[in-house]
Amino acid sequence: MSVLEVVLYPDEGLAKVCEPVAQVDDELNQFIDDMFDTMYEHEGIGLAAPQVGVLKRVITIDIEGDKTNQVVLINPEILESCGETGIEEGCLSIPGHRALVPRKEKVKVKALNRKGEEVIYEADGLFAICIQHEIDHLNGVLFVDHISALKRQRIKEKMQKLKKQIERAK
């Protein structure tokens, strides 16, 4: 298991639509373990594969962060959604920035688990918000795409400066 490098906004890979996973195997499960390690290392509650540079439809979630309720969604698809909600969201690919994002209050999602079995989750609250946020990543959408162009541009400029600082420090 290892911690992977998190891709930072405005990296072009974060704006790409991910390919479905064709086969759930040992290699994918190792990658999922690495995704969880990365998510915990950065104190996140969700992580999508494109955030670590892999354009596949894989999500890891652990709302509590205690490793007892790990959720893996492979090729997730929202079947139903209802209600309106929203919270200030953050993102491991956009550290230090948050914004209020409108979301559905409840979602029903179908996916494969890490054994390749079909699972269905009926989620609400933070779990539903996290699912929507991570599925957005799989579709090349970030939380900043839900905010005004001016705010998005300010965040983009700050993130470009941060990326330059990180590159110089290497």
From Swiss-Prot:
It catalyses: N-terminal N-formyl-L-methionyl-[peptide] + H2O = N-terminal L-methionyl-[peptide] + formate. It is an enzyme of class 3 (hydrolase). Its EC number is 3.5.1.88. Its cofactor is Fe(2+). Belongs to the polypeptide deformylase family. PANTHER family: PEPTIDE DEFORMYLASE. This is Peptide deformylase. It comes from Actinobacillus pleuropneumoniae serotype 7 (strain AP76).
